[in-house]
Amino acid sequence: MPIKTFKPYTQSRRHMSVSSFSNITKTSPEKSLTKIIKKKGGRNNTGQIMVRFRGGGHKRFYRIIDFKRDKFNIPAEVMSIEYDPNRSSSIALLQYLDGEKRYILYPLGVNVGDLLVSGPDAGIKPGNSLPISNIPVGTFVHNLELVEGKGGQFVRSAGVAAQILAKEGDYAHVRMPSGEIRLIRVKCYATIGQVGNLDHENITLGSAGRNRHMGRKPHVRGTAMNAVDHPHGGGRGRSKGNNQPRSPWNQPAKGFKTRPKKIWDWVIISRRNKS
């Protein structure tokens, strides 16, 4: 979707940009596919803060998304393309021939009225879901399963796509959006094409108010805290007082490896690109 900018009649509007929503065809969601989300403010069941700087924001209804695409060999018509406040990508409403409706992630290039199918015999066209064994090498895919039948877990953000590079036995070599090349079982399902809403990465919020509207609270610097609250806190003036940057829990930051060497690291052929 194209990006809309504004004249700088205030300082926050100067750099603000929003999506034009030009491809959105329906404004209200399908009521049977929504449920209420209760905001937690980053807290767990005992009230402790598990994720800092979360809270507030606009009320949202959760749209139930079909990540499994397990209604095989039944054509579904794309009824509408809708906005989803819970994710960066748009969503598409499908209606199957038997009358059932489901939401899926909106694949780039799919239009209202198109027919989509999932199953081993589906054609290679954007929006169709197939096992990796039936997808040609070089094809771009999204909504990629990691465990057979569990539903898509990888490649679901706006504008991303993974590429199938090779197939060898029970596994396929897949290049992820991060640049990592890893093995995924060929029985896992993936959806053809790229996730829509490509211009999401170009949107600039422009004001603190829009951040609060999304449920994000101000991120406090460690040097602005007291010594009891952060390793960088305290002291005379704004000085963190130590040489190496650290997290609030005193773990070295900026380059310190925190990922454990797990048993299944053998599935990673090539590590991701590091910026």
UniProtKB/Swiss-Prot annotation:
Single GO MF annotation: transferase activity
Stretch list, region Disordered: 222-257
PROSITE patterns the UniProt entry points to: RIBOSOMAL_L2
Self-association and partners: Part of the 50S ribosomal subunit. Forms a bridge to the 30S subunit in the 70S ribosome.
GO BP annotation list: cytoplasmic translation
Coiled-coil region list: none
Stated role: One of the primary rRNA binding proteins. Required for association of the 30S and 50S subunits to form the 70S ribosome, for tRNA binding and peptide bond formation. It has been suggested to have peptidyltransferase activity; this is somewhat controversial. Makes several contacts with the 16S rRNA in the 70S ribosome.
Keyword rRNA-binding: yes
Family: Belongs to the universal ribosomal protein uL2 family.
Protein name in UniProt: Large ribosomal subunit protein uL2
SUPFAM superfamilies: Nucleic acid-binding proteins (SSF50249), Translation proteins SH3-like domain (SSF50104)
GO cellular component: large ribosomal subunit
Domain of life: Bacteria
